[in-house]
A protein has these predicted regions:
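Conserved hydrophobic/aromatic pocket- or pore-lining residues that grip, position, or stack substrates
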Residues: 1, 32, 78
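Low-complexity, Ser/Thr/Pro/Gly-enriched N-terminal "stalk/linker" regions
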Residues: 1-21, 199-200
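Hydrophobic faces of stable alpha-helices that mediate helix-helix packing
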Residues: 48, 75, 79, 157-164
Length: 202
């Protein structure tokens, strides 16, 4: 975690479990907020927004994965969770949705620039949600090697679609977001082309 000296975790965060998993995990937290939104929407929105604040999000746009390895990559589900929380709360808090969208643009750019190493819209990953079933350590790939992953690429396609859906919601209030709709549609199209060209099996 030596590259995360900016991180200042003094907030009350949702944990996967008080006993077995007493630490935050950014993607677990995103799923928790969808449930919390039915009970306390403001708390759910706070949980999502705080992980995108400058004292958590890396200056390069990465989100901290979990306490023992902030650098790991978790599935990018924050956009999906933010939109679900917005909808559960009555689709009225556009200030929240807009703020989250702007921060997620930084995170999305980090994924595109860092994880698509070959620029072919086929994404690498690491740990991407497959708990304890990887046949190899996908986080620590040997020097000179790389793994292009079907699941990493699928998660990025999902991320594109969620950002597109958020941009559509925002564009209904502010036409300036229409160009962002096209941006994410173009990204999604590029990923589908990349999948067709590369193949997702070996």
């Amino acid at each position: 975690n030596q590259n995360w000296r900016h991180l200042d975790a003094y907030d009350v965060l949702s944990m996967p479990d008080a006993w077995e998993y007493p630490w935050f995990a950014a993607w677990d937290l995103a799923f928790h907020t969808v449930v919390f939104a039915h009970i306390d929407p403001e708390y759910a929105k706070y949980q999502l927004a705080v992980m995108l604040r400058e004292w958590y999000m890396h200056p390069n746009g990465a989100l901290p994965a979990y306490e023992w390895s902030f650098d790991d990559r978790n599935p990018p589900v924050h956009a999906w969770a933010a939109l679900r929380v917005f909808e559960i709360d009555g689709s009225r808090d556009f200030t929240f949705l807009q703020g989250v969208f702007h921060k997620l643009l930084i995170n999305f750019t980090w994924w595109v620039n860092r994880v698509d190493a070959q620029g072919n819209n086929v994404f690498e990953g690491g740990f991407l949600g497959l708990d304890n079933i990887g046949p190899i350590d996908r986080t620590h790939v040997p020097a000179g090697c790389r793994i292009e992953q079907a699941d990493g690429t699928a998660w990025m396609a999902f991320y594109c679609l969620q950002m597109l859906r958020i941009a559509m919601r925002l564009a209904a209030k502010d036409p300036a977001y229409r160009s962002m709709m096209l941006k994410f549609l173009e990204h999604f199209s590029g990923i589908t082309d990349g999948v067709a060209d590369a193949g997702m099996w070996d």
